[in-house]
């Protein structure tokens, strides 16, 4: 483990208001998203769509990294150049999703545990040869009646810590993502309670595995009321409750925090990130690692005509990335949305 390499990479991931695009959807998730826009989910269509994202001009102004899927990190553009090499030339860090997905947690109905530790050391070594500089592992925590259980939080935190240790051993920065789902009708107070519990256990387990916090990036859920809650959360409430949860649980020497959008609306995710950065008062950079909240308009425009709409789709990608980059600096205003090219 080279601590300086890890620190340098982690710092680059959260520098200068830049964020990370999550383009690591599994083939199954891609199938769902492509079906909604009427595009067959073939391997070639997935390659062309990801090529549209990866070759967007000048998006390195707003992005520090892209999380790729196993299939994608092995793919090439139309000219035979590997996607990871294109990103590296742009100054964008290639990352890789390494978990094997959330599986049913034994004896705990409706709860999940993330698998994928078997063979991970060897997979990380291979991904490093492809140019991967960081990795991602996502745990899924459901908020509901008597959920999450202590067993669910512990099992996921322990697996995530072992993953993080293996990453650092390979000089790959781990993104740890304990996602508290926003499905359901829970209040923002319940979201806060669960988020604090999940984060506290995650960092306890990371410390137990001797993981170096300066070489870790947290991908955090925002503290927000469930989608079906009668009272929805304002950006100010989300900012106050989220920063309160982070201050209570996250070590000051962590490299940085990037937020997942978790099914929020595109502008909602941007507004909430901006509110947090305007509030400030935390020791870490606060940025974004969005999938749908950036890709929604991109996929829609591309799907209308995959060969002719590449430029339009890329303009949407650049615009949403720019809006979120401004939000990561507390410089966003909803008035700016009037300039959007879609």
Model-derived segments and their meaning:
Residues 120-206:
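Helix-rich catalytic cores of soluble enzyme domains
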Residues 182, 186-253:
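Catalytic core of soluble alpha/beta enzymes
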Residues 93, 173, 215-217, 256:
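Proline-centered loop/turn at the N-terminus of a beta-strand
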Residues 70, 139, 220:
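Residues that line or immediately flank small-molecule/substrate-binding pockets and catalytic motifs
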Residues 100, 141, 180, 222-224:
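Short, histidine-centered active-site or binding-site loop motifs used for metal coordination
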Residues 1-130, 143, 231, 235, ...:
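Alpha/beta catalytic barrel-like cores
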Residues 66, 135, 174-175, 216, ...:
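Hydrophobic residues within beta-strands of alpha/beta enzymes
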Residues 42, 137, 176, 218, ...:
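Conserved, mostly hydrophobic/aromatic
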């Amino acid at each position: 483990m080279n601590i300086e390499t890890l620190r340098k990479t982690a710092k680059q991931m959260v520098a200068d208001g830049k964020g990370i695009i999550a383009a690591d959807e599994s083939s199954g998730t891609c199938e769902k998203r492509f079906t909604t826009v009427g595009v067959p989910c073939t391997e070639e269509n997935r390659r062309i769509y990801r090529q549209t994202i990866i070759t967007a001009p000048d998006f390195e102004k707003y992005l520090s990294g892209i999380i790729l899927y196993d299939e994608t990190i092995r793919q090439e553009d139309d000219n035979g150049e590997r996607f990871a090499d294109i990103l590296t030339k742009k100054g964008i860090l290639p990352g890789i999703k390494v978990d094997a997905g959330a599986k049913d947690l034994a004896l705990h109905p409706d709860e999940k545990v993330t698998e994928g530790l078997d063979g991970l050391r060897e997979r990380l070594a291979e991904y490093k040869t492809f140019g991967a500089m960081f990795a991602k592992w996502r745990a899924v925590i459901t908020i509901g009646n008597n959920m999450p259980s202590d067993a669910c939080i512990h099992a996921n935190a322990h697996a995530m810590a072992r993953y993080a240790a293996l990453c650092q051993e390979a000089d790959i920065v781990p993104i740890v993502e304990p996602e508290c789902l926003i499905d359901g009708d829970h209040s923002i107070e319940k979201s806060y309670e669960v988020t604090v519990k999940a984060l506290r256990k995650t960092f306890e387990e990371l410390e137990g595995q001797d993981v170096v916090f300066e070489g870790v990036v947290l991908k955090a859920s925002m503290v927000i009321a469930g989608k079906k809650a009668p009272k929805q959360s304002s950006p100010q409430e989300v900012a106050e409750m989220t920063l309160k949860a982070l201050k209570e649980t996250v070590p000051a020497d962590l490299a940085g925090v990037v937020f997942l959008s978790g099914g929020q609306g595109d502008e909602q995710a941007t507004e909430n990130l901006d509110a947090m950065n305007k509030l400030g008062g935390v020791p870490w950079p606060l940025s974004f690692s969005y999938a749908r909240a950036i890709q929604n308009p991109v996929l829609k425009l591309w799907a209308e005509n995959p060969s002719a709409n590449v430029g339009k789709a890329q303009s949407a990608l650049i615009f949403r990335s720019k809006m979120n980059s401004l939000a990561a600096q507390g410089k966003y205003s909803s008035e700016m949305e009037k300039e959007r090219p879609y």
